[in-house]
Amino acid sequence: MQQSTLLKPVSCYGIGVHTGKRTQLTIEPAKENTGIIFIRTDISSENNYIEASYYNVSDTLLSTTISNNHKIQVSTIEHLMAALWGCSIDNAVIKIDGPEVPIMDGSSKPFVFMIECAGKKLQNAPKKYLKILKEIKVVNKDCELYCTPSEHITVDLTIDFSSKAIGKQNLNFGVQESFTKNIADARTFGFIKDVEYLKSKGLAQGASFENAIGIDEHDKVLNPSGLRYADEFVRHKLLDLFGDLYTSGISIVSAIKGYKTSHAFNNELLHKIFSDTTSYKFVTSNELS
């Protein structure tokens, strides 16, 4: 299997869920072995590019933010990163004229649509995978995330909220599953009381029922159209996981299991994997059974 990029550039406009500001984002083709690079076109400096890497993650409080050594940053990258992973795009340059990736409808589906419209191009370099060789685990109280050796990518993810609108949900994602069909359109979600507080602090300025699932104090989903899936919440958490893990710069081959995961946990797992060179090896598709 070969690396791939886009056939042609593709653009969109949208608002940032936290900044509330309208930005233009363009995904462009890139050469083999480039990886995923963000460029802030609103900053006229040669230091305006940021590699979408786990070691550049600078904030994980409400979303995943990456920054470079010059404190140039791009936030809320996880839904776009998940779409790039789900569409098997290895190399791309993402140009954006603001500090936050547009939230679109709160899922990865609009970005998947963009990539499908642009088309995919196979490149003259083999696609590589990161194969996990031993168990790697991160734990904090009752939250945990770990990966174990496997010949395929599988995920067993559980979320557990006190809200009756969400409750406890579990999802198993196997090699036969389709991210673009079953996961990509699951939207982000939040509680109205939290959104009101965040807005008072200058955050969530772009949040609305058009780009997020809203839950009130009575555990009721307020979106007029309701949910896209009964388990849309855990599907979106899986989407976030895939997006965050793709900041590894490579597709990970492992059996992954998580309970009450977060952006911080996802990033911590990557740091732990790459801190131990005996825990993984790079392989091509021909080396996978």
From Swiss-Prot:
One of the Pfam families matching this protein, by short name: LpxC
Residues where Zn(2+) binds: H79, H236, D240
Catalytic activity line of the entry: a UDP-3-O-[(3R)-3-hydroxyacyl]-N-acetyl-alpha-D-glucosamine + H2O = a UDP-3-O-[(3R)-3-hydroxyacyl]-alpha-D-glucosamine + acetate
Active site (UniProt): H263
Pathway note: Glycolipid biosynthesis; lipid IV(A) biosynthesis; lipid IV(A) from (3R)-3-hydroxytetradecanoyl-[acyl-carrier-protein] and UDP-N-acetyl-alpha-D-glucosamine: step 2/6
EC number: 3.5.1.108
UniProt xrefs under InterPro entries: Ribosomal_Su5_D2-typ_SF, UDP-acyl_GlcNac_deAcase, UDP-acyl_GlcNac_deAcase_C, UDP-acyl_N-AcGlcN_deAcase_N
Coiled coil segments of this chain: none
Keywords recorded for this protein, A-Z: Hydrolase, Lipid A biosynthesis, Lipid biosynthesis, Lipid metabolism, Metal-binding, Zinc
Cofactors demanded by this protein: Zn(2+)
Molecular-function GO terms, alphabetical: metal ion binding; UDP-3-O-acyl-N-acetylglucosamine deacetylase activity
GO cellular component: membrane
Swiss-Prot/TrEMBL GO biological process terms: lipid A biosynthetic process
PANTHER family: UDP-3-O-ACYL-N-ACETYLGLUCOSAMINE DEACETYLASE 1, MITOCHONDRIAL-RELATED
Function text: Catalyzes the hydrolysis of UDP-3-O-myristoyl-N-acetylglucosamine to form UDP-3-O-myristoylglucosamine and acetate, the committed step in lipid A biosynthesis.
Family, as annotated: Belongs to the LpxC family.
Protein name: UDP-3-O-acyl-N-acetylglucosamine deacetylase
Source species taxonomy: Bacteria, Pseudomonadati, Pseudomonadota, Alphaproteobacteria, Rickettsiales
Gene that produces this protein: lpxC
